[in-house]
């Protein structure tokens, strides 16, 4: 489950196909029990596909123990990814929503969803291997590399956002059509959490603090011990350029 409140979508996420609000409170999906939360650190800057820093929290993602560069359950709006399978492709949106595209043996270069409103994924050969392009009905295109990592967002009018990554796949830089960039900096190798420490934007630096919460489990003679190696890392504080620290 993704956004529970009739999502408006984002640069790399489609809105809810129904637009139905099933949320309550902060908000909680009454049907699935999933808690979804959106936080806007930097609203989209002016212009087509203007830079933004928007975080999405999804409790299903946190419960599954998915690793995140921000902290358990959180993703940036540019963190939509593609999971590649032998019989299907699966889009995992930044808000946690998932869209399945079945492979068609008769048309191996195209994969379709059961919902035509989700568009289709086309597969093409590129220098680094296969490249996957998610075509939205409205004309937007999302380009993923051979590992399923988002590398470009193309507007119908031709402007595009480029995403630069490390060899390991870490997002390092996001550049919008106006030439403005976000630069992502990560905690050092000696840190217990190798995730995002700062994001430098045209309006200043945003800093992110995380804290580990160790899980307990059965130890010798039935005693419970903390399992630091399985600790959940939670996002605890965000500091804005004006030194305004906000707890999440």
What does each model-found stretch correspond to?
Residues 53, 72, 83, 87-248:
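Extended charged/polar low-complexity repeat regions
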Residues 1-116, 228, 243-248:
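Short secondary-structure "cap/edge" segments that initiate or terminate local elements
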